[in-house]
Regions:
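C-terminal hydrophobic helical "lid"/dimerization subdomain
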Residues: 4, 295-353
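Glycine-rich beta-strand-centered segment in the early N-terminal region that forms part
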Residues: 31-50, 59-102, 108-109
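Short, well-ordered loop/turn sites that connect or cap secondary structure elements
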Residues: 87-88, 154, 247
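N-terminal Rossmann-like NAD(P) cofactor-binding module of classical short-chain dehydrogenase/reductase
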Residues: 95, 228-229, 254
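NAD(P)H dinucleotide-binding glycine-rich loop of Rossmann-like/cofactor-binding domains
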Residues: 97-164
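Mid-domain Rossmann-like dinucleotide-binding core that forms the NAD(H)/NADP(H) cofactor-binding site
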Residues: 137-210
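Short amphipathic alpha-helix with an adjacent loop that forms part of the alpha/beta core around
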Residues: 211-223
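Glycine-rich phosphate-binding loop and adjacent beta-alpha segment
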Residues: 235-314, 349-353
């Protein structure tokens, strides 16, 4: 017998601009979005994963841009409880994300008991992955997939440098590059070396102990990288502007894009310097290898292919820590330390693992 779907639910709602403790409110009467269109499903959320871009947008965007109030976050896992789709049925255990167009349309994010989601943004959760593990696979996983498998098309024997190997995108990028036969060098702080090597990195660089562009020049100028993956965000433009010394001109510098925390003067200046370097012609000192930004878009075919790596065990989910639903603010505190190794997950349904 099907469980009745309630009219209201508990949810963490972004109600104001600021840090998560000021921006979010726990509501117990947020409406459940039930009016499904064709190709949509209603998911009973089991777990939701946090993304750094979420709390950064809390701080940066004014209300009229952010569309507040709105339930926070994008990544989730759960069970389909209502369906207007031919592929996904009631009772299917799924994971995926809420794309930005649906987010704006419904004001419904992942940090709630129920979420209305386009069916093509979800795939069936493999049996070898728990709901908590699955919650954090999509946004960062598909970003890494786009970088390694579509933009770079990394092949066997190629050399890849991942800046930020302990970030979720970086850890997925390392694994995907190794699956495709590449040699991977990755950076992180010393405390994360074992984690980065566990992901598959062949060599490790402690970025806190060296001038990174200088170190890469000294060690890799005669064996240049085919691709550089900037998984941190544009924190140091010199990694690109000095990359002719260690990046093949036939390769590319591929970034997750700017990740400002508060639009400080230094952050804006770094973005400006990188933007200028991106468009400067080679004839007047521009870099030989192109700079490419990757922004993930909803693509079911990509999600299915990425899922295949998860299902066969060649790609590991990356969970740093797990918090109960009412402790979501503590989860954000963990994320904001910058010390998380992989995904910070909020368990919405206390009965799942």
């Amino acid at each position: 017998m099907a469980t009745a779907i309630p009219d209201v639910q508990s949810a963490w709602v972004n109600v104001a601009r600021g840090t998560p403790d000021k921006a979010l409110a726990f509501k117990e009467d947020w409406p459940v979005s039930k009016n499904l269109s064709d190709g949509e499903v209603l998911v009973k959320v089991h777990a939701a994963a946090l993304n750094p871009v979420g709390y950064k947008l809390f701080r940066i965007l004014p209300n009229f841009v952010a569309g507040r109030p709105r339930v926070a976050e994008y990544d989730l896992s759960g069970m389909v409880v209502e369906s207007k789709d031919d592929r996904l049925k009631v009772g299917d255990h799924v994971y995926g994300w809420i794309p930005s167009n649906m987010f704006r349309k419904t004001d419904q994010g992942a940090l709630a008991q129920y979420a209305r989601v386009p069916a093509d943004a979800l795939v069936i959760r493999p049996a070898n992955v728990t709901p908590v593990q699955a919650a954090g696979l999509t946004l960062t996983g598909l970003t890494a997939y786009d970088i390694i498998c579509k933009t770079a098309k990394v092949g066997s024997g190629q050399r890849v440098f991942v800046n930020g190997g302990s970030t979720a995108v970086g850890a997925f990028a390392i694994q995907l590059a190794k699956i495709r036969g590449a040699k991977v060098v990755a950076s992180a702080s010393a405390s994360k070396e074992s984690f980065v090597r566990e992901m598959g990195a062949d060599e490790f660089v402690d970025y806190t102990k060296v001038d990174l562009p200088k170190y890469l020049t000294e060690k890799y100028s005669t064996s240049k990288f085919d691709y550089i993956v900037e998984a941190v965000g544009i924190s140091d433009p010199s990694l690109y502007t000095r990359s002719d010394a260690y990046l093949s001109p036939k390769g590319a510098f591929i970034s997750v894009g700017p990740q400002p925390t508060g639009m400080t003067t230094s952050e804006l200046w770094n973005i400006a310097k990188t933007s200028l370097a991106m468009v400067r012609p080679k004839i007047v000192g521009g870099n030989k290898a192109p700079f490419k930004n990757v922004i993930v878009i909803n693509d079911l075919a990509d999600a299915i292919e990425f899922r295949r790596y998860v299902a066969d065990g060649s790609l590991k989910p990356i969970v740093d820590s797990v918090y109960e639903f009412k402790d979501a603010l503590k989860a954000y505190e963990r994320l904001m330390t910058g010390r998380a190794k992989g995904k910070v997950v909020v368990k919405v349904d206390p009965s799942v693992d």
